[in-house]
Amino acid sequence: MLLSTFNKNVHSFDSLESFGDKEIGILASSMKENCQSKQFFLNLKKNKQYPQFGSIKDWEKFCLKLEDTKSNVKNLITKNIRIFKNNNPAGLITGYYQPIIKVSLIRNKEYKYPILRKNKIYDLKTRAFIDKNYKNDDIILWTDDYINLFFLQIQGSGIGIFEDGEKIKIAYEGNNNLPYKSIGKVLIQQNKLNPKEVDLFTIKFWLRDNQKEAYSIMKQNRRYIFFKIEESNTSMRPRGALGLELKPNFSIAIDKNIYPIGIPFIIEYVKSGKRKLAISHDTGSAIKGYNRADLFTGNSSDSEKIAGRLKKKNFL
């Protein structure tokens, strides 16, 4: 994990590994974006362990140096950023992606499942209640498949595609303030799936192969996600908790109760020993712990495959 501090007990940036110019470049551009974000500094100061991950003053000084640096960004980061490896047990890194889902502006026999905007009346109401009692005024789009809608909610954002091929950006707007429950764990507990085989694809396959039981499983995750349509002139990428666009295979979701969103990290895989740079742009209800992370894999044709299979032990 990287942090802006001059604590003598932590290591210099290049004491673990020399990263390539491409990774350093993405890190630098991400940190420049953070420097322009008021939310980054607010999150930093609100963190329970402030100023462990760098004080406001430290980061403001670093941001000024980063803005003025036209070349040799790697040298700047090496001199100003330090690495700290926490001593907590290894955690888990998983992946999430931006799904593409069929949508329509009107309801018909095919498109009969509503995508809803946030409304306070749904607070603390279960998934089953909302599915039966939603208000028509809260519908922003219709979709053709409840399972795909369920996983759109799990991922937190997506791209809607109309029958004519036009695309629309579906962004996270809020939730019903009930806790998230993994249906993968439910399927394991009910002996419907082997723990060693559970991933995104085996869960989806089971739901589609067991249509009569599928909804009773999905409704056990009482957390419901609401969306909004976001204007997109250029990029269809989703925005994270800082309001900044997520970077494929670089942005991670972390536990915001431990780390301030926006700080950079090194992910160290336990089995292979390989390391990669990342930056914390997001958070999630299932992401809890010092070494727990969720890597955003993008919205390409391979993004779902990568995210669905990613399940490795790691350190941050």
Stretch-by-stretch model annotation:
Residues 2-316:
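Solvent-exposed, well-ordered loop and adjacent helix/strand elements within mature globular domains
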